From Swiss-Prot:
<feature type="modified residue" description="N6-lipoyllysine">
    <location>
        <position position="67"/>
    </location>
</feature>
<protein>
    <recommendedName>
        <fullName>Glycine cleavage system H protein 1</fullName>
    </recommendedName>
</protein>
<dbReference type="InterPro" id="IPR033753">
    <property type="entry name" value="GCV_H/Fam206"/>
</dbReference>
<dbReference type="InterPro" id="IPR000089">
    <property type="entry name" value="Biotin_lipoyl"/>
</dbReference>
<comment type="subunit">
    <text>The glycine cleavage system is composed of four proteins: P, T, L and H.</text>
</comment>
<dbReference type="GO" id="GO:0005960">
    <property type="term" value="C:glycine cleavage complex"/>
</dbReference>
<comment type="similarity">
    <text>Belongs to the GcvH family.</text>
</comment>
<feature type="domain" description="Lipoyl-binding">
    <location>
        <begin position="26"/>
        <end position="107"/>
    </location>
</feature>
<keyword id="KW-0450">Lipoyl</keyword>
<dbReference type="GO" id="GO:0005829">
    <property type="term" value="C:cytosol"/>
</dbReference>
<dbReference type="InterPro" id="IPR002930">
    <property type="entry name" value="GCV_H"/>
</dbReference>
<comment type="function">
    <text>The glycine cleavage system catalyzes the degradation of glycine. The H protein shuttles the methylamine group of glycine from the P protein to the T protein.</text>
</comment>
<dbReference type="Pfam" id="PF01597">
    <property type="entry name" value="GCV_H"/>
</dbReference>
<dbReference type="InterPro" id="IPR011053">
    <property type="entry name" value="Single_hybrid_motif"/>
</dbReference>
<dbReference type="GO" id="GO:0019464">
    <property type="term" value="P:glycine decarboxylation via glycine cleavage system"/>
</dbReference>
C-alpha cells in the first residue's frame, strides 16, 4: 500500500509525508507511518477548509500530539478540494492506519513540485537510519 505513493521526507524537520496521485491533478496527502508513530497519540487535527489556496510548505493542518502542537505543511502548492472528516472526528486513525487515513486532497497548482517528491524505494534507507538513530517505536501502526 505504501509503495504506490510519493514521499516528502525531511528527517531534520521530523517531516514524513505521503502524496498519492488521484488523477486530474488531484493529490491525496497524508502522514507516513514513521510520523504517525512519532505523533502517537494524536489528539486533534485541524485541517484548512475546502477552497483554501496554499503555497508549498504552508500549514495544511495543525496537529496536537502528546504535549506538542505542530503544523503539518503542504507538500504541494494547491487548493484544498476535500478534507477527511473521519480523521478530524477520530485523529488516532492516522496513528493506526496512516496510509488509508488521508488528511486532505489538493488540486495541484504547480505540477513541477511533484518532481521533488521521492518514491518509496528512494526513501527506505533514510527512514531506516532515522528509526535506528531516534529509536522510533512503530508498533502502534497497523498498516
Amino acid at each position: 500500500m505504501w509503495t504506490d505513493r510519493l514521499y516528502r521526507v525531511e528527517p531534520y524537520r521530523m517531516l514524513f509525508q505521503w502524496v498519492k496521485d488521484e488523477g486530474n491533478g488531484i493529490y491525496s496527502v497524508g502522514m507516513a507511518s514513521i510520523l504517525a508513530a512519532l505523533a502517537y497519540p494524536l489528539y486533534s487535527i485541524k485541517i484548512k477548509p475546502v477552497g483554501t489556496k496554499l503555497e508549498y510548505d504552508e500549514a495544511l493542518a495543525i496537529i496536537e500530539a502528546g504535549k506538542r502542537v505542530a503544523t503539518f505543511p503542504t507538500p504541494l502548492s494547491g487548493i484544498v478540494v476535500d478534507v477527511n472528516e473521519e480523521v478530524i472526528k477520530n485523529p488516532e486513525l492516522i496513528n493506526k492506519k496512516p496510509y488509508s487515513s488521508w488528511i486532505a486532497k489538493l488540486k495541484a497548482t504547480n505540477l513541477e513540485e511533484v518532481k521533488n517528491l521521492q518514491s518509496a524505494k528512494e526513501i527506505v534507507k533514510t527512514v531506516k537510519d532515522f528509526i535506528i538513530l531516534e529509536d522510533v517505536d512503530c508498533s502502534i501502526v497497523e498498516e
